[in-house]
Amino acid sequence: MQGLGKKVLSVLVFVAAFVVVKYGFDAYQRYKTQANVEASMAKLKADGVKNNPNLPVSEAMGREAVAKTSEQLSAEGDEKTRRARAASSYFGFYLVNTRTRPEFCRQQNVDITPFVSAFEREHKAESAQARAALAAVDTDENQLFGLVEKQLKQVIVQDMNDIAASNKVSVREACQMIASNGETVAAEMHISKVQPAVYRTLTTGRP
């Protein structure tokens, strides 16, 4: 089970949503326009594919997301804003796995509740910290989710197709793999392991 969980995790690249919601946060603060979110998402995809041409699209986007998020957190001088950026990145990671992915798999007639429940337990403390950081700038995860829900659905379609192709299974079987190994996958993908910079900023305020 451990090996399978790692194999799934290597392709899932849940971090693709980090910058989607980080960009969503910026767009909401600056322009409050859906068009800006879509343009940012398109750039993330283009840059990811350009810089990682031999990787599946979702994994290329994930690597680009991690790099950009780390750079932007390091460049932010104001701690409150830095925490809010980290929180928005965190909730991209969190919501794509607790809302968008379960919805996708339900459409495949697969219930991944075991994974979702384990994921929520693993991130209870971080979710509380992220909510506090967003509250400090007068927003919350539901506002962020509403802004980028369309983009998260696009990320999931690409992501799940990549999982299926990598493991030589159908998309429905990919959902079943996640459900069957929910505890293992959730434990392996704690925010501190997947995106240390976001975790560090959430918990200490430092980039």
Name these PLM-found stretches.
Residues 1-5:
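Short, Lys/Arg-rich N-terminal segment immediately upstream of the first membrane anchor
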Residues 6-9, 105-108, 173-175:
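Functionally engaged cysteine thiol sites
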Residues 7, 26-30, 203:
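The feature captures two recurrent sequence modes
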Residues 19-33:
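Membrane-interface motif at the C-terminal end of an N-terminal transmembrane signal
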Residues 29, 33-37, 45, 152, ...:
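Hydrophobic face of amphipathic alpha-helices
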